[in-house]
């Protein structure tokens, strides 16, 4: 038997190349790239509308006047007489007209509404010549919900289910809480498959108010197909995507989402299901995804790098507060990710990442300038990286780089859209993450790409910590076009602990901390192709200064040396 022995320099070169592959292109990086594009928030395209309560106008009249020295109240339980007296103090001990007195009485209903209640105030027949005025207050009670249904319509969600959402936090015969009622209606309206509005009407009993619900069906499904060049050079920049959502197929406010993605070197699929739990607004669900990649370009192509990734996640979401102008939600998920990477058909790595997440998000509409909206989120991740099933050489490298074991991560995102006129708006974004440990590629923060610093390729510039800031100015043009100018800035810190545990040398091959920045412009068209809503966008971007963390030959991680970057995307909705 003949035994062939490779020269040591060839063996060293092969191991070095395989090590570089694991850092540059692997299943964790590819999955992270896809999940980043999926989580992008669509830009607000029109000013948000906020319902504002307007105070009744002050009356000016020359009618006979009289002086009120004291108000007394009857029927008030939710607001004390002292508080009502203070509210009406501007009408005390001065000459007022009868119309002004009526205005004062009517304003009490505004006070109640500001506190989330419905009440009517009236003046009974009385002698007010002594300056004592008695006001009768009727505090509304909830009489229940009434359904306004079309007998010829088969509703996507059983109307009785929607009715239970309203009555869950609004008990019949109890004091009508407008805030609780509004929250329940908004939650019901968010159920997939139904559009819910309400109006208040007099109940069957004196002092009661009913909620009249108007329910309309939404489509059975919504779908979108798209093509873009947002992918990486190594696995094919041109990506084809198809996404479909099936709204309430079980008739209970449930939702099924299916997503598919294909490029020359990548295939990805994701399936999710979620449904309401009870009638408080709590939703829970489960989702799974699978990824397969093959490197089709780049210096490492001869090693035939390939790999897979699978994820399984259980999630929950609860609306803590809902109103027309402000939302606050809590969310949590538990997930497992499994990654396998090969080079020259040999297993390079086989490992798991387990993650427990707790997060909160809010959304606030404002009336600054024309109008605006701010959304923010914060997430805490507790994770564990388990490389025990990987080859010993890979395990050793992860121990040396201190990425094995437990890690904690804090992530945040802030997005503000402000409308100055009907056609001019700005968008400010700031998001990032902090970590207490060196992270695996699947958990890192990436700077480059169409959703990051747009002057750099996808997945360029990654770190265990980092942040991105972008500022955009949008101008609506004629013929459904929008022009945008933007500036992007990103910072990344590759390793929290930059000292190799085995050698004492630095883990980072270049700079451990660096920033990337660029500017550019885009043009977007939104309209209809036939009866299908469609979009097309083109982005041009140019970097400010050179790549701060280039390859040895001065190129980007994908081998390119672009002076300008161009991104394209086209989509069609069904």
Model segments located where?
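Periplasmic polypeptide-binding modules associated with outer-membrane biogenesis and secretion
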Residues: 24-231, 259-268, 410, 429-432
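Repeated loop/turn-to-beta-strand initiation elements of outer-membrane beta-barrel proteins
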Residues: 196, 221-223, 250-256, 279-285, ...
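Residues that define the transmembrane beta-barrel architecture of outer-membrane proteins
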Residues: 207, 236-240, 265-269, 308-312, ...
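Membrane-embedded beta-strands of outer-membrane beta-barrel proteins
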Residues: 211, 242-244, 271-273, 314, ...
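Transmembrane beta-strand segments that form the barrel wall of outer-membrane beta-barrel proteins
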Residues: 221-231, 242-248, 252-264, 271, ...
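Outer-membrane beta-barrel proteins
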Residues: 231, 246-250, 272-279, 315-323, ...
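Transmembrane beta-strand segments of outer-membrane beta-barrel domains in Gram-negative
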Residues: 283-437, 495, 515, 556-557
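C-terminal transmembrane beta-barrel domains of outer membrane proteins
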Residues: 398-574
